[in-house]
Design a protein with these regions (language model features):
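Short hydrophobic core segments
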Residues: 7-9, 131, 150-163, 228-231
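N-terminal Rossmann-like FAD-binding beta1-loop-alpha1 element of flavoenzymes
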Residues: 6-31, 394
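Feature captures the FAD/FMN-dependent oxidoreductase FAD-binding
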Residues: 76-154
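Glycine-rich FAD pyrophosphate-binding loop
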Residues: 23-45
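Glycine-rich active-site loop/strand segments that organize a redox cofactor
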Residues: 49-94
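An anion/pyrophosphate-binding glycine-rich loop and adjacent beta-alpha core
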Residues: 36-38, 43-44, 52-59, 92, ...
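A glycine-rich dinucleotide-binding beta-alpha-beta segment and adjacent secondary-structure elements
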Residues: 127, 297-372
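Glycine-rich loop(s) and the adjacent beta-strand/alpha-helix scaffold that form part
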Residues: 154-200
């Protein structure tokens, strides 16, 4: 039987960072993971370059039934703190768009950073570790792992959500929460492409691969202004991934395919200058040619010249292109989702320490809880911030134990 000050389950972004921070501040930490290598999701992120944070992180960019929960951790360990750490390791990075920060080279640099930080903290890492059971007694938490018994006063669950099951995602964290009486909110895929109903999908098949600037609005009024991508399964691209987290089955989304153009004014100006120009060629000045041709074949764009376009048809066209209402059939689900919405109810946890109120010594960090960020590095920042907050609490306990030990030795010596 082995004893540790803290055991962290899950060698992803949150788990590795928490273990490293606690280890460097004096805790004897064991990091467990069921995979063959640590940081698997990190390696896949950002097209292999890891969008490790965002310059514009703020609580408003996170979804949760308790929108105030994330404020404390995000304020205590900020994006600038992690950027400073990245700089210490000499990792070159760049801003891609909208404050999204990526490694110039490879996501492996972030994994190596985390492993180096763990090594500094003397963290033991054990991979391919299957946790058969978790029990709690007077000694703390007792884990059965690969035929061994491990005991710890502090157990940190950083096992993530259900997104990308091919990278080892599992409901382990939710099961542990429920075992100890914590409420787990319903989960669903977030930051995920939409699928379309068959008739519309068939009509739009020719557009697969076409990307356009857009604004996309959910029924609750949430709006994102980013690119939309037509795919052979439906709709994707940053705009769709963002809005998917705010969409509910059966709802419509409204798409503006010309967010940077006042179409009415543009058509009027072109009519004055080129009255005999075809409407199709005029629209192709603002939209991809394939999109214009598809819409014309579907009867959405009249086959007329500008001087033949009447007021009513122009108004209908403007509504079609700037307020296209789409009812998705669903999403591609956890297989391609970047995150999991829902999870451990944050009302069950301390926002300062991430500790479960009903189960002292049990902590939850990262994606496993009901905090989900926007696309663009926000979820990595939540991993760093929640992990850091938890690590400080673990260190407080470790320090208390060491102080007590020193006092006993001092009294005995006296």
């Amino acid at each position: 039987m082995e004893r540790f000050d803290a055991i962290v389950v899950g060698a992803g972004a949150a788990g590795m960072f928490c273990a490293a921070q606690a280890g460097q501040l004096g805790c004897r930490v064991l990091l467990l993971d069921n995979g063959k290598k640590p940081g698997r999701k990190i390696l896949m992120s950002g097209g292999g370059r890891c969008n490790f944070t965002n310059m514009y992180v703020e609580p408003a960019a996170y979804l949760s039934q308790n929108p105030h929960f994330c404020k404390s951790a995000l304020a205590r360990y900020t994006q600038w703190d992690f950027i400073e750490l990245v700089g210490k390791y000499g990792i070159a990075w760049h801003e891609k768009t909208l404050g999204q920060l990526f490694c110039d080279d490879s996501a492996e640099q972030i994994v190596n950073l985390l492993l180096a930080e763990c090594e500094k903290g003397g963290v033991q890492i054990r991979l391919r570790s299957e946790i058969l059971s978790v029990e709690r007694d007077e000694q703390g938490y007792r884990l059965q792992v690969n035929g061994e018994t491990l005991v710890t006063k502090k157990l940190v669950i950083a096992s993530g959500g259900l997104s990308m099951p091919g990278l080892g995602a599992s409901p382990f964290g939710y099961k542990v929460a429920e075992q100890f009486g914590l409420k787990v909110l319903p989960t669903r895929a977030g930051l995920v492409p939409f699928t379309l109903h068959k008739p519309l999908l068939e009509q739009l098949q020719v557009l697969s691969g076409v990307s356009v600037p857009s604004t996309i609005t959910a029924e609750n009024g949430t709006l994102f202004r980013e690119n939309l991508l037509f795919t052979h399964r439906g709709l994707s691209g940053p705009a769709v991934l963002q809005i998917s987290s705010y969409w509910q089955p059966g709802e419509f989304v409204t798409v503006n395919l010309l967010p940077d153009c006042d179409l009415d004014d543009f058509l009027n100006e072109q009519r004055s200058a080129h009255p005999n120009q075809s409407l199709k060629n005029t629209l192709a000045m603002q939209l991809p040619k394939r999109l214009v041709e598809c819409l014309q074949q579907l009867g959405q764009i009249p086959d007329v010249t500008l001087k033949q376009l009447n007021v009513r048809d122009q108004q209908t066209l403007v509504e079609t292109l700037t307020a296209w209402r789409v009812q998705p059939n669903g999403t591609e689900g956890y297989r391609t989702a970047e995150v999991t919405l829902g999870g451990v109810d944050t009302n069950e946890l301390s926002s300062r320490t991430m500790e479960a109120r009903k189960a002292p010594g049990l902590y939850f960090i990262g994606e496993v809880m009901d905090v989900t960020g926007w696309l663009g590095g926000y979820n990595f920042q939540w991993a760093w911030s929640s992990a850091w907050a938890c690590a400080q609490a673990l260190v407080e306990v470790c320090s208390d134990n060491k102080v007590c030990t020193l006092l006993i030795k001092f009294v005995h010596k006296a």
